[in-house]
């Protein structure tokens, strides 16, 4: 049973059905399945990695985005592949239509339009709650072996537009007010978070001649491995800026802003602040950049990215009309803030099942995250784990395996007091977690769970074999500056060498297109180049270019694995260890882990804390050995 048909709910319900579980999705409005409530875009820095990982695991977000995207770009294209991010503007109407089409045509999956009012549960002999099903607003009762909550911003949702407050989970949609009570009654810790959205304006009322144009890439990237012959029709976005007059209007109305009057209690997203928050916090800035993003292929409405606000409607109108190009803009939908309940994610196992309530899984904004991609990634993991748990199995991803693993580990071990979003900087091993190798990292899991077919799996394994054999050859063979080799390098436009060099350093020296790289590899003695896919060739180049750094990160992972095997002495005292917070010390004393591996599994114990513990265990052993001497 999946509750909520947003991005998390869609991935959770489809993946569980594909794995063979009879699945039922309950959502408030079927026509709003996977609706893009905020900006009409998917991907970006860090977020693009999540979409690629979802796709590699057999999810649908990448497929849908490629089908309905109206602009595609690579962000950070001038930087290394580890920090690049694919981003697409989407037709938000078609996105929802395609998601609904996939869901309604997925075997084992049924859907109904209702609102869940409460959870059905009981307690076992040890006092742990066991969730059995749900009751809905139309008097129906559903029993299920597993329940996944993907409620988004709908748990006691409260919309703010100036002084006006509406009990909505999204503007115009009702908000379940009682479901949170079930969670609290079972002992789960709830908090309040806040997010917001921008006004939308009629494209016919915009003066585009006054704006900067922002086009997609000439060679548009795509998200899904299923996408072939990709040539989408792309629409431009447009750039404009706030100005001093805009800021004066906002400052003059701080006293009417729910964010500052105390009307809003929830904590908002740090990396997506409202315009009133930006004007207040960055008083020295004379302008803020805004992007006008088309919401559909027809470009009827535009989303003003960067102008999230909950100011009163008359102030919103004055603010928008003070901006260049928008002097006569007609507002079709006003911006608003929304507060909602979330469950403190330290209440979860890494499988996304709640610790206090058996059979209950949570995914998406209910876990304190923000963003479609973060929600979808949790949804697919919750769906996989809920299904596997029927066989007493589970599936988790480590921090060195996927950004999904980084995100879930952050949430479960550290918790969050503000909406959490993924960044590449959150990953310790980001050179290993690139967008381009997501299918290699996760494809085997997808095949194991029946989420990709044998043909796709065979392709993945062939690529893996080609890459491993080629990299192994390149790192163990050299090239000399002979006349024939210098001639060969010159013919490919490559600089000469003066000394003997490893082949892997030659391959990774210069940016080459796929055809030239194939020619170079053939000259260097690789015999099966023609049978390699373009993706494998790309991987060989990237692995060669960053070979030394990648090897270093792999060594760090090996060292971490060894470190986690270290046992904690029985007489080891956690008190007063420099570098450990009081909270960490209290948890270590409470759970008394026998090893660093067990310590690492405790919620709130960070990798940095493990490093400190490892050091002081070493010093403890050293001190004892000195005493014995």
From Swiss-Prot:
Any GO MF annotation of the entry: flavin adenine dinucleotide binding
Principal place of residence: cytoplasm
Superkingdom assignment: Bacteria
Cofactor: FAD
Keywords assigned by UniProt, alphabetized: Cytoplasm, FAD, Flavoprotein, NAD, tRNA processing
Function (record text): NAD-binding protein involved in the addition of a carboxymethylaminomethyl (cmnm) group at the wobble position (U34) of certain tRNAs, forming tRNA-cmnm(5)s(2)U34.
Protein name listed in UniProt: tRNA uridine 5-carboxymethylaminomethyl modification enzyme MnmG
Naturally occurring in which organism (per UniProt): Helicobacter hepaticus (strain ATCC 51449 / 3B1)
Taxonomic path: Bacteria, Pseudomonadati, Campylobacterota, Epsilonproteobacteria, Campylobacterales
Gene name of the record: mnmG
């Amino acid at each position: 049973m999946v509750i909520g048909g947003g991005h998390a709910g869609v991935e959770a319900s489809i993946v569980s059905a594909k794995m063979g579980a009879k699945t039922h999705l309950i959502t408030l409005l079927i026509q709003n399945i996977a609706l893009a409530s905020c900006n009409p875009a998917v991907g970006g820095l860090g977020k693009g990695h999540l979409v690629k990982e979802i796709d590699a695991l057999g999810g649908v977000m990448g497929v849908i985005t490629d089908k309905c995207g109206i602009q595609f770009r690579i962000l950070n294209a001038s930087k290394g592949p580890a920090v690049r991010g694919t981003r697409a503007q989407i037709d938000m109407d078609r996105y929802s239509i395609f998601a609904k089409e996939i869901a309604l045509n997925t075997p084992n999956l049924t859907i109904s339009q209702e609102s869940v009012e409460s959870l059905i549960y009981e307690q076992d002999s040890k006092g742990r709650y066991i969730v059995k099903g749900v009751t809905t607003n139309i008097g129906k009762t559903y029993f299920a072996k597993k329940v996944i909550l993907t409620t988004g911003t709908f748990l006691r949702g409260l919309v703010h537009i100036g002084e006006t407050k509406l009990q909505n989970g999204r503007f115009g949609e009702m908000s379940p007010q009682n479901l949170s009570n079930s969670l609290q009654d079972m002992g789960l810790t709830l908090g309040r978070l806040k997010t917001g959205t921008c006004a939308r304006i009629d494209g016919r009322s915009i003066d585009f001649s006054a704006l900067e144009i922002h086009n997609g890439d000439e060679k548009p990237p795509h998200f899904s491995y299923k996408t072939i012959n990709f040539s989408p029709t792309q629409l431009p976005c447009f750039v404009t800026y706030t100005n001093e007059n805009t800021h004066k209007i906002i400052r003059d109305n701080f006293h009417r802003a729910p964010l500052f009057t105390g009307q809003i209690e929830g904590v908002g997203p740090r990396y997506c602040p409202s315009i009133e928050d930006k004007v207040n916090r960055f008083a020295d800035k004379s302008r803020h950049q805004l992007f006008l993003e088309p919401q559909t292929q027809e470009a009827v409405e535009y989303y003003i990215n960067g102008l999230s606000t909950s100011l009163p409607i008359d102030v919103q109108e004055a603010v928008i009309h003070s901006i260049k190009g928008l002097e006569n803009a007609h507002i079709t939908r006003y911006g608003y803030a929304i507060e909602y309940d979330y469950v403190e994610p330290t209440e979860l196992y890494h499988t996304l099942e709640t610790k206090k309530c058996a059979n209950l899984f949570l995914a998406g904004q209910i876990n304190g995250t923000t963003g479609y991609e973060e929600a979808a990634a949790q949804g697919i993991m919750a769906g996989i784990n809920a299904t596997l748990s029927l066989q007493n199995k589970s599936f988790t991803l480590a921090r060195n395996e996927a950004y999904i693993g980084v995100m879930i580990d952050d949430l479960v071990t550290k918790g969050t007091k503000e909406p959490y979003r993924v960044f590449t900087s959150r990953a310790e091993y980001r050179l290993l977690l690139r967008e381009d190798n997501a299918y290699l990292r996760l494809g085997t899991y997808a095949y194991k769970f029946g989420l990709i077919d044998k043909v796709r799996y065979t392709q993945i394994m062939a690529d893996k074999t080609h890459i491993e054999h080629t990299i192994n050859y390149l790192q163990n063979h050299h090239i000399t500056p002979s006349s024939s080799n210098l001639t060969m390098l010159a013919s490919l436009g490559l600089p000469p060498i003066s000394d003997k060099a490893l082949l892997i350093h030659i391959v990774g020296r210069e940016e080459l297109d796929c055809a030239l790289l194939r020619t170079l590899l053939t000259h260097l003695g690789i015999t099966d180049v023609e049978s390699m896919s373009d993706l494998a060739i790309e991987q060989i180049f990237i692995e060669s270019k960053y070979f030394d750094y990648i090897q270093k990160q792999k060594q760090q992972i090996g060292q971490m694995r060894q470190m986690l095997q270290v046992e904690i002495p029985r007489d080891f005292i956690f008190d007063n260890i420099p570098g450990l917070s009081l909270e960490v010390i209290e948890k270590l004393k409470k759970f008394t882990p026998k090893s660093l591996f067990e310590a690492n599994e405790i919620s709130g114990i960070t990798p940095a804390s493990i490093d400190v513990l490892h050091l002081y265990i070493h010093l403890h052993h050293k001190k004892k050995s000195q005493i014995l001497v």
